[in-house]
Amino acid sequence: MDNQFIFKYSWETLPKKWVKKMERSEHGNRFDTNTDYLFQLLCFMKLHTYTRVQVLIDICGVDYPSRKQRFEVVYNLLSIRYNSRIRVQTSADEVTRISSVVSLFPSAGWWEREVWDMFGVFSINHPDLRRILTDYGFEGHPLRKDFPLSGYVEVRYDDPEKRVVSEPIEMTQEFRYFDFASPWEQRSDG
């Protein structure tokens, strides 16, 4: 059984409202879904006989500030039985909440915390959704494209006081232009 069979079978079996877009490549299959059907789709991928996804490799976030739903959350899955990789993607904005998949894949707990900490995408029913990489009092989400390059506060060790101090940064941020074109491709200006 190969990626092509899994792709074709999934297309014929899955409810059409669960999948917005499907794409097949030599590296695996990609399914774009609405946040409302994310949990059901991942449950299908894990439990169905012809997909049998046992491993959630990781969850990543991507920020596209020009989109209405600016955040894309990507679930990379692996079916060991069928030697197949499956990528499930969903989009969210600042207020959209995504269903936690910790009950399906216990390892998702760490990655959902990371996506929350770095991007601010909230997972509903997560057992312990708190910051994982930044400090307790940290404000903002540092992998968002609108996060200031220098941050909001400077944290340093003050030798005379013998403690770590946080001070607000008082320099203004320069304008940032997001050019998504590859710097290695030649652009024609005209």
Curated annotation (Swiss-Prot):
Its EC number is 7.1.1.2. It is an enzyme of class 7 (translocase). The keyword Transmembrane does not apply. The keyword Membrane applies. It is a peripheral membrane protein. Keywords: Electron transport, Membrane, Mitochondrion, Mitochondrion inner membrane, NAD, Oxidoreductase, Respiratory chain, Translocase, Transport, Ubiquinone. It catalyses: a ubiquinone + NADH + 5 H(+)(in) = a ubiquinol + NAD(+) + 4 H(+)(out). Disulfide bonds: none annotated. One of its GO terms (cellular component) is respiratory chain complex I. NCBIfam families: NuoC_fam, PRK06074.1-5. Core subunit of the mitochondrial membrane respiratory chain NADH dehydrogenase (Complex I) that is believed to belong to the minimal assembly required for catalysis. Complex I functions in the transfer of electrons from NADH to the respiratory chain. The immediate electron acceptor for the enzyme is believed to be ubiquinone. Belongs to the complex I 30 kDa subunit family. This is NADH dehydrogenase [ubiquinone] iron-sulfur protein 3.
